[in-house]
């Protein structure tokens, strides 16, 4: 219901994405893995956001301008808790705890200089002990040749 994937349009002489694009994609993918590994009932939204946000910045990319993820329910942006930073515009939503049965997106992004934005958006179900991905994760860049 709310997924994003990263695609790269190859030039005629290319058979894969350039190293800078691949590196950005790998950082996004790893940031999702790290956040998901800590996403479980009782965690506050800002704690999960901070994991992905810090990892991306440590890898040398700029901070992304939005929260890591939002709840999904009857609407694309639904529910209470937000996987986001403690920014004024989000109010108390990042301070709320994640609950079993919630569904969240995990959608970090980064800008790859001279190429554009890389992002992946996954959806997860919060389980008793963690989270479960609701669709097959994107593990490689989709290429258009």
Across the structure, where does each feature detected by a protein language model lie?
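Active-site neighborhoods and metal-handling regions in enzymes and metal-associated proteins
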Residues: 1-145
């Amino acid at each position: 219901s709310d997924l994003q994937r990263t695609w790269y349009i190859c030039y005629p002489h290319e058979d894969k994405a350039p190293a800078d694009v691949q590196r950005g994609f790998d950082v996004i993918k790893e940031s999702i893995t790290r956040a998901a590994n800590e996403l479980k009932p009782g965690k506050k939204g800002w704690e999960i956001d901070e994991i992905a946000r810090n990892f991306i910045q440590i890898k040398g990319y700029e901070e992304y301008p939005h929260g890591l993820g939002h709840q999904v329910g009857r609407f694309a942006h639904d529910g209470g808790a937000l996987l986001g930073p403690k920014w004024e515009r989000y109010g108390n939503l990042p301070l709320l705890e994640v609950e079993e049965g919630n569904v969240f997106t995990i959608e970090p992004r980064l800008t790859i200089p001279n190429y554009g934005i890389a992002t992946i958006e996954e959806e997860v179900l919060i389980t008793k002990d963690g989270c479960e991905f609701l669709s097959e994760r994107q593990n490689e860049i989709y290429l258009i040749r």
